[in-house]
């Protein structure tokens, strides 16, 4: 876990350390908007538009692993999955965005902004489902960049959180790669499908965003990929 010394100033009356002023203005709530990127587009989740594509991208004998650490197991049939997407699309918190692959025009995953706290300017990215066509592509990284940019630059949040099952090694590697700082483990934090879940907590702060933004944009630049579409430099190499 990264060591952290909180910024402080002395209280003028007691001399004891207190937090620095952060302002009392609230952040804005995320909206159902379209966020356009080079490789992917985020748009409000819609059961009519997105169910068929998402079902194909996330269901099949070779795709059970996609659901391993999510709250829901793989769905038994298309109708159940559509009802699931309808419920998610109607939610305001979490607020779901479909991830659209711009080359194919198909929905290949979804992600959310959740635990939305405009007063304290804290928000979380979660409920991330990447179908097999999205995994390990530039669009998978860009989908995260687009939400981060929206959160920090448009909505004005101070803290952006990532939480996952502590046993979910791929999610934890992704958090590290995307520039989140590991903050610790919440033991016996919740139960998922009647099993214990210890939760790993990560965050990016608004003061850290400019450096992370530079790294994302440099990595996503088409010049960072060869003619076979392979990266020339890793995202971590730009930090």
Describe the predicted segments one by one.
Residues 162-171:
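Conserved beta-strand-loop-alpha-helix junction that forms the acyl-donor binding cleft
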Residues 181-195:
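Conserved catalytic-core motifs of GNAT/GCN5-like acyltransferases
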Residues 2-137, 150, 195-200, 204-210, ...:
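GNAT-family acyltransferases
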Residues 140:
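Glycine-rich acyl-CoA binding loop
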């Amino acid at each position: 876990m990264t060591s952290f010394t909180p910024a402080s100033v002395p209280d003028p009356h007691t001399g004891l350390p207190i937090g620095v002023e952060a302002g009392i203005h609230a952040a804005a709530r995320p909206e159902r908007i379209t966020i356009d990127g080079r490789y992917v587009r985020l748009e409000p989740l819609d059961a009519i538009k997105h169910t068929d594509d998402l079902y194909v991208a996330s269901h099949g004998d070779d795709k059970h692993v996609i659901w391993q650490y999510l709250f829901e197991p793989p769905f038994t049939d298309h109708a159940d999955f559509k009802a699931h997407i309808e419920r998610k699309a109607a939610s305001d918190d979490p607020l779901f965005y479909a991830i659209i692959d711009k080359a194919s025009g198909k929905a290949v995953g979804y992600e959310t902004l959740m635990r939305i706290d405009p007063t304290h300017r804290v928000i979380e990215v979660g409920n991330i489902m990447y179908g097999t066509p999205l995994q390990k592509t530039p669009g998978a990284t860009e989908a995260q960049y687009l939400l981060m940019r929206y959160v920090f630059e448009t909505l004005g949040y101070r803290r952006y959180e990532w939480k996952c099952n502590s046993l979910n090694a791929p999610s934890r590697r992704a958090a590290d790669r995307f520039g989140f700082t590991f903050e610790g483990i919440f033991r016996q934090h919740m139960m998922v499908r009647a099993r214990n879940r210890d939760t790993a907590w990560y965050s990016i702060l608004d003061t850290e965003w400019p450096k992370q933004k530079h790294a994302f944009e440099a990595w996503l630049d088409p010049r960072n990929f060869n003619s076979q579409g392979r990266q020339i430099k890793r995202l971590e190499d730009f930090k």
